[in-house]
Amino acid sequence: MLRLAAELLLLLGLLLLTLHITVLRGSPDSSSNSSHSLIQNEPSSDSFSFNPSDRQEYLDEATRRAFPKHRLMTSGHTSLQRDGTGSFLLDLPNFPDLSKVDINGQNPNIQVTIEVVDGPDSEPENEMQKENMPSWPVPSPDWRSWWQRSATLPRMNYGDQDYKYDSTTEDSNFLNPLGGRNRQVPSHRTFDTKEQPEYDYVDGEGDWSSWSVCSVTCGSGNQKRTRTCGYACTATESRTCDMPNCPGIEDTFRTAATEVSLLAGNEDFNATKLFGVDTDSCERWMNCKSEFLKKYMHKVANDLPSCPCSYPTEVAYSTAEIYDRIKRKDFRWKDASGPKEKLEIYKPTARYCIRSMLSLESTTLAAQHCCFDDSMQLITRGKGAGTPNLISVEFSAELHYKVDILPWIMCKGDWSRYNEVRPPNNGQKCTENPSEDDYLKQFQEAREF
C-alpha cells in the first residue's frame, strides 16, 4: 500500500516537472531574461543539449532562480511571481504549510500605510514628509515660553518690582518698613519721570500695557497697567494721578480756610497768639472753645469717616476707596505711616497709620487719622491712637502744622490732655486697644512726664 502511494507521488512529481519545463519553453520572455536561462553561458544560442546529470542541475538552477521572494503589496495580500503577462509559476516545493496557520492571528508580512492629503495639488515631497512626521502635536512657541517662565518663576524677585508705593517723600508702610528698623528697604520710584522703571522679570513675558485712564476726571485718582506673567497670571501695577481741581472746589476750600482763620478769634490767622509761649500754653489751647470752633468740630465729626478696625492693606499700594457702613458711602484713604507724618514721634506705639482724603463733598478741610499696632488692629486709646486733623496736610502742610501739630508740642507730648480736645475715633465700636492695664500705665507715665 505504501509502495503504491509512493509511486503515485512520483508520477505526480514527474507530471508537474514536465508541465514546468513546458511552461518554461513556451514563455516569450524566457529567451530575454538572463537570470532565468543558462543560454548566456553557451557559445551558440541556436540549439542546446545536455545529459541527464546536466538536466538535473538545470532543473535545480531553474527552480532557485525562477522564484524570487514574494513582494508585499499595500493592499494586504501576496502576489504570485509572474514571468509574463499570460503565465504564472506555482512553486510547490517552497509553498508554505497552511495546515498550522492561525487564521485569527495578525500577518507580520502585511504593511498598511495611511496617508492624508490636503488637496489634489499636493506634491510628492510633501506627502513623504507627512508620512514621516510624528503623530503628536508640536508645542507652540507660547507654550514653550510659558514652560520656561513656570520653571523659573519661583526664583523671581518680587521685592523691587510689584506694587510701588507712589510718594515723592521717603514715606514707608508695612510693605516698606522704616529705615530705623534695621531692614533693607528697596528704593522708591516716582512716576513723574518719563523714564520707565526697570523690572527683574524673566525673559518671555509680555510688555506692559499702556496706563489706563485716570479713575477720576478731577482731583486725585489712580491708574493701572497690566502685563502677562505666565499661564493664567496677570501682574498689575498702579500709580496715583493728579487731575485739575474739580470745578467749585477752590471756593469750598477758600471758604473753609476762612473759617479756620477764625479759630484764633480774628480773621487774620495768627498762630503766635493762639500758641503763645507762656507758663501753660497747653491749658490756654484747651480752653479755646469759641462758638465757631464748636460748630467746626461738629462738622468734622459729621463729615469724616470712621476708622476701620484693622489696617486696610490696599492703601499700602496707592489711594484706595473703602466703604464706610456708618456713612453708607465710599471714602478715599491713603497710607500715612512714613516720616512725612512723623509717626515715630507723635504716635510712638503705632506701627501703621492711614489718613482720609479730601473730596468735593467735604464740608471742611479736616482729615481722619487712624493708627494701628503691630498686629494691624486699630489703636482706640492711649499715646498711639490717631486723632482727627482739623486741617489736612493734603490742603496745606503749613496750616496742618500750626493747627494740629503745634498744640501737641505746646502740651509737651502729653497725649492725655491733647486727646481730651481731639478724642480718637472709634465710630465702628472696635475692641478697645490697648488693654485697660496698658492704658492706665501709659496714662500715669504721661502725667508724671
From Swiss-Prot:
Residues carrying sugar: 33, 270
Chain intervals for the UniProt region annotation (Disordered): 27-55
InterPro entries referenced in this protein's UniProt entry, alphabetically: AMOP_dom, Angio_Inhib/Adhesion_GPCR, TSP1_rpt, TSP1_rpt_sf
Record domain TSP type-1: where: 203-247
Cleavable signal peptide: 1-26
Family designation: Belongs to the isthmin family.
Disulphide bond pairs: 214-241, 218-246, 229-233
Segments of skewed composition (Low complexity): 27-53
Record-linked PANTHER family: ISTHMIN-1, ISTHMIN-2
Species of the source: Xenopus laevis
Source taxon at top rank: Eukaryota
Principal subcellular localization: secreted
Subcellular location per the Swiss-Prot or TrEMBL entry: Secreted
GO biological process: negative regulation of angiogenesis
GO cellular component: extracellular region
Record's keyword terms, sorted: Disulfide bond, Glycoprotein, Secreted, Signal
One family name in Pfam for this protein: AMOP
Protein function: May act as an angiogenesis inhibitor.
Notes concerning its domains: The C-terminal AMOP domain plays an important role in the anti-angiogenic function of ISM1.
Residues in AMOP domain copies: 274-437
Name of the featured protein: Isthmin
